[in-house]
Amino acid sequence: MDFPSEETTKTLVQKFDMVIFTCSYYSNLNDLRLQQCLKTLNDKSFGATIIPIVIVDGSPPEVHEFLKSNTKALVFKEQKKYGKGKGGALREAAMIAASLPGTTASTWLCWQEAEKSDMNRCWIKEVMNQNQPHDDIICPDRDDTCFKKSYPIEQYHSEMYGNHYLNCIMKKQLEDSTHSCRDIDWHFGPFAFRKKLLHLWLEYKGTSYDAQLIPIVAAIRKGYQVNSSIQVTFMLNEEMKNQEEGSLDFIEKRLNQLNDLDPKIKQFWSDPLYC
């Protein structure tokens, strides 16, 4: 499908003053996550014809062309202009999102994983109705009932543990600070920031999940307003839960995330600011 016109994109941006951006990689056309991504992009009520969605995709040519031709989202081939891995693709997508016609310094740039189809609804119906003019960053908080019901049970417990750990670290680090922040759902994934804070994400060079979260820590340390109190009734796709629950590979993936990501976040509270 062809990209929407600049005027159409501008109208979509200004409707909610937001842009969703994400990145993707699918090894083949049978990947369950590719189908979930298309659900995200093509939802009739909350998809790319309602909200501008930027996706930077690093899939093989056949998969990339399939994705691009089956949605009205703004699908770009990853150029690796901003580094390697998920982090580089995230920064590339953020830069494109910030460059869309109609965006201003206060426009919300909303990151989410492409497979989190229900998050589009949450942005429009829950987050954008509750954010405040003084908010700089939003870290949505999952409703616990929805979280526990829709996620693989192992992921529910690992992410709850990780959140408690990272919030304990944050409270300790802010004890003697003039800055404060409510508990954050660190391991959820989706977050949003005003376009004026784009530099916090572009200047951090992490290549994985740290590229999402370290800039949030930097923002807290610099005194920006982080709203982590907006609760969302997000439900993970049932097909993903069925694929992952009880799978040793996915259980070990969650364990590796805790052992790799969380220590990086802890360390950055003490490291010099990069920005």
Annotated model-derived regions:
Residues 13, 209, 213-275:
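C-terminal catalytic/acceptor-binding lobe
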Residues 104-117:
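Short beta-strand-to-loop acidic/aromatic patch adjacent to the donor-nucleotide binding site
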Residues 39-77:
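Acidic donor-binding segment of Leloir-type glycosyltransferases
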Residues 3-9, 22-46, 59-62:
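Short, well-formed alpha-helical segments that are part of the catalytic scaffolds
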Residues 117-148:
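Conserved donor-nucleotide/metal-binding helix-loop-beta segment in metal-dependent transferases, i.e.
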Residues 162-163, 186-202:
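Conserved nucleotide-sugar donor-binding
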Residues 136-184:
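Short, flexible, basic/aromatic active-site loop/helix in glycosyltransferases
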Residues 80-99:
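Glycine-rich, basic loop-to-helix element that forms the pyrophosphate-binding segment
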